[in-house]
């Protein structure tokens, strides 16, 4: 992962689980990281441990604010974006037969719509560099 030195990377879902581990590994590689999530205490813990980590609290279910988030996150990273790791997501404990339409829409908005919009607005930033990477992660941990 040496080729990530000084690369500007956004990681969503960084306040727990896989996202937290991704931030730690990227920091070891020398990347500049913008970690986002909903649990500010966990984000602040990451920031206090690593020099290359900046944080922004953001709830990706707020799809109308995603474009502004990408703008703010890119500005925090100095204006350039090399990669976004779309790691944030949710699951419901209900079986499909018991899931309400509201629960279904929330899962779709967070896991699909927000990932699409994060990627869409990140691409606009990456086009300035004429390169970039988008990594989408889905899992149930």
Which residues are covered by each model-predicted region?
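Conserved NAD(P)H cofactor-binding loop of Rossmann-fold oxidoreductase domains
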Residues: 87-92
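Residue(s) in the substrate-gating loop at a strand-loop-helix junction
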Residues: 139
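Substrate-binding pocket helix/loop in short-chain dehydrogenase/reductase
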Residues: 95-96, 103-108
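Conserved glycine-rich Rossmann-like NAD(P)H-binding loop of the short-chain dehydrogenase/reductase
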Residues: 29-44
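Conserved glycine-rich cofactor-binding loop
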Residues: 15-16
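A short, exposed helix-loop element centered on a Lys and neighboring polar residues
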Residues: 119-120
